[in-house]
A protein has these predicted regions:
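A conserved amphipathic helix/loop scaffold
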Residues: 1-195
Length: 195
């Protein structure tokens, strides 16, 4: 999931998984919890050398369980390793996602299906908000180049184009997978796949 041990800023719950569960990450507990009675001059207490009997993360069937609140730690501390860990766990569950897009982390993807119109529409958004006082604002819109997109659809796609530019895109069909590249967009574009 990640290549080396790392610090989790919040405590873990002690969970004992089913014996058929796959252990994805082990846990090393701190020597002690920092309190007024037990103080360490470092921000974090060093961890014990032996691995805990309680795992940090495990997978059982189609469920992944984490002993640490990964989402809250990322929200509170913004550590990239927590975001990567979450993404890797999600990838373990989503073996064949319907849409894959290579965008920077601030990118957003939205897929719509208009069955009456025989088309799919993929919206791509990218902007980097920055903190200005209490508000997050978008000062600069940066163009994004050569965005790779894959979508799994059962329908026989005939035409792919960007709107509102009405720029037709080349695409590759392989079984149910459509692969294409959006040459450039700034802030937003929409890809239409007609079948």
């Amino acid at each position: 999931l990640v290549s080396s041990p790392f610090l989790n800023y919040l405590p873990a719950i002690k969970i004992m998984p089913h014996n058929r569960a796959e252990i994805l990450a082990t846990l090393r507990e701190p020597y002690f919890n920092r309190t007024k009675a037990k103080y360490s001059s470092h921000q974090n207490t060093p961890y014990e050398l032996q691995i805990s009997q309680y795992p940090s993360i495990y997978k059982y069937d189609n469920v992944v369980v984490s002993a640490h609140p990964i989402d809250r730690m990322y929200l509170d501390y913004g550590a990239q390793i927590h975001r990567e860990l979450f993404q890797n766990l999600l990838n373990k569950l989503l073996k064949n996602p319907m849409v894959k897009v290579k965008l920077p982390s601030s990118g957003r993807v939205n897929l719509l299906h208009f069955s009456k119109d025989n088309r799919y529409v993929i919206h791509l958004l990218y902007a980097t908000p920055i903190q200005r006082g209490v508000a997050q604002v978008i000062d600069d819109l940066v163009p994004i180049y050569n965005t790779q997109v894959e979508i799994m659809v059962e329908e026989d796609v005939k035409k792919v184009y960007l709107i509102p530019e009405n720029l037709e895109l080349e695409f590759i069909k392989s079984n149910n997978k459509i692969s294409l590249t959006v040459p450039e967009f700034t802030c937003h574009t929409a890809i239409v796949l007609e079948y």
